[in-house]
Amino acid sequence: MIVPNIMLLTSYGCTPCLRVKRILNELKAEMPDLCVQEVEFKSASGATLSLKNNVLYPPAVFLDGKILAKGKIDAEKMIVAIRESRGSS
């Protein structure tokens, strides 16, 4: 079984970011070995990620180093992609 690595590009006070974070936490409850890392949009690493991937504002979700979703994130599509990357649907 493959354990996906999730990175959430977020920002303080960002309501859509909180929604995506909640969804990822629920998914983590279902898949305890899921690795979720938060990166602050305004940090040096966040700025590098956003420039490299043309992310103009948070949130953005990366799956195994590749952008999965950004901006207005479709939760269902995100969940399906994470489950599929894990080898379960």
Model-based region annotation:
Residues 1-30:
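Local sequence-structure signature of Cys/Sec-based thiol-disulfide redox active-site neighborhoods
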Residues 17, 33, 59-60:
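Hydrophobic residues in alpha-helical membrane-spanning segments
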Residues 29-33, 84-87:
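Secondary-structure boundary motif
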Residues 33-46:
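Thiol-based oxidoreductase modules, predominantly thioredoxin-like and allied folds used
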Residues 52-62:
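Structural micro-motif
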Residues 63-89:
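Non-catalytic, surface beta->alpha helical segment in thiol-disulfide oxidoreductase systems
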